[in-house]
């Protein structure tokens, strides 16, 4: 719920999905097995706001299995070395479940973890409430520049298919921004599309742009 409210719940956009969040929460439960629910929430934000990425989050030791299947290993695999925010699945073969994360989306998520921890501290001091933690992310108030990607189709079925195709490639666009500007320009993709009731069979995606 928190991830959706704060705009960081979308694996296809380069954020995290259900499996990723479940592993992150499970790791906190391992670290603090006797903690109360409110303490677990506070520790969640504290740990991940201070986590030394790209050190991986794991629930168990990564082991080579008897079948010889490849497992996540940045020492051997060049592609694994480039992963920004490794969250490793516990079952064999252990793989990075968050390979879609980019420099831009990692930055956004760390900012959100930091905000969450600061609010949890304020809650402990009676300076904030849990409602503050779940405030919607003010996406259209934070950036000076936005990129709009518009989609038009002849009918609703074509629009649905076209939207899926475009959505799956927006992450690649973010990576190209980073690569061709040497990470001087970063992009924050909004995790969902928008529509305009006055323009049927149209849909829009937005990215907030900022310079480092």
Kindly give the residue locations of the regions a language model identified.
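Non-catalytic helical "accessory" subdomain of NTase-fold nucleotidyltransferases
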Residues: 1-212
């Amino acid at each position: 719920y928190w991830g959706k409210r704060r705009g960081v719940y979308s694996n296809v956009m380069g954020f995290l999905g259900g499996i990723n969040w479940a592993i992150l929460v499970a790791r906190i439960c391992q670290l603090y097995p006797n903690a109360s629910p409110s303490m677990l929430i506070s520790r969640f934000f504290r740990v991940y706001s201070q986590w030394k990425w790209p050190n991986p989050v794991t629930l168990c030791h990564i082991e080579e299995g008897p079948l010889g299947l490849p497992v996540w290993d940045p020492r051997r695999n060049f592609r694994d070395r480039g992963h920004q925010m490794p969250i490793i699945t516990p079952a064999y073969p252990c793989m990075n479940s968050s390979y879609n994360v980019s420099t831009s989306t990692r930055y956004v998520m760390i900012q959100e973890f930091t905000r969450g921890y600061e609010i949890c501290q304020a809650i402990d001091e009676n300076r904030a409430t849990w409602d503050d933690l779940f405030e919607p992310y003010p996406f259209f108030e934070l950036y000076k520049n936005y990129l709009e990607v518009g989609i038009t189709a002849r009918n609703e079925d074509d629009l649905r298919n076209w939207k899926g195709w475009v959505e799956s490639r927006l992450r690649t666009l973010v990576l190209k921004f980073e690569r061709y500007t040497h990470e001087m320009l970063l992009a924050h993709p909004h995790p969902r599309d928008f529509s305009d009731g006055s323009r049927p069979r149209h849909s829009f995606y937005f990215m907030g742009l900022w310079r480092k």
